[in-house]
């Protein structure tokens, strides 16, 4: 069963992976997507993409360093999400904004939670 998308779209402790840097980055992703929702401009969309891509790169680095077994599948999900976000243009449609929010919620709470205590 999917997890609900918070409204307003803000990070809370239910999203903690208990790696402070990654939690801070997740918080920043939520903030930039929230800002894109409220001020649907090319600059905010670009910032959301950059913050998300940088986080994915760092998270993947941690996975490689820890020899995390789910790395390849996890990286593929990141690549597919970034490709989808690259296809967005501002103003981003409500459907695409919801897609991004829902994807992040489901990804963190199902996929990212798998690496808790393993990195």
UniProtKB/Swiss-Prot annotation:
Annotated Fe cation 1 binding sites: 26, 55, 59, 112
GO MF assignments: iron ion binding; oxygen carrier activity
Domain of life: Eukaryota
PROSITE patterns, A to Z: HEMERYTHRINS
Protein's UniProt keywords contain S-adenosyl-L-methionine: no
Function description: Hemerythrin is a respiratory protein in blood cells of certain marine worms. The oxygen-binding site in each chain contains two iron atoms.
Record's protein name: Hemerythrin subunit B
């Amino acid at each position: 069963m999917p997890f609900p998308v918070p409204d307003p779209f803000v990070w809370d402790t239910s999203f903690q992976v208990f790696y402070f840097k990654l939690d801070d980055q997740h918080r920043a992703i939520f903030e930039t997507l929230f800002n894109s929702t409220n001020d649907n401009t090319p600059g905010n969309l670009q910032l959301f993409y950059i913050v998300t891509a940088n986080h994915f790169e760092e998270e993947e680095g941690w996975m490689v360093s820890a020899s995390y077994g789910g790395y390849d599948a996890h990286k593929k999900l990141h690549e597919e999400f970034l490709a989808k976000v690259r296809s967005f243009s501002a103003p981003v449609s409500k459907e695409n904004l919801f897609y991004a929010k829902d994807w992040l919620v489901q990804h963190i709470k199902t996929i990212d939670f798998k690496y808790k205590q393993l990195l």
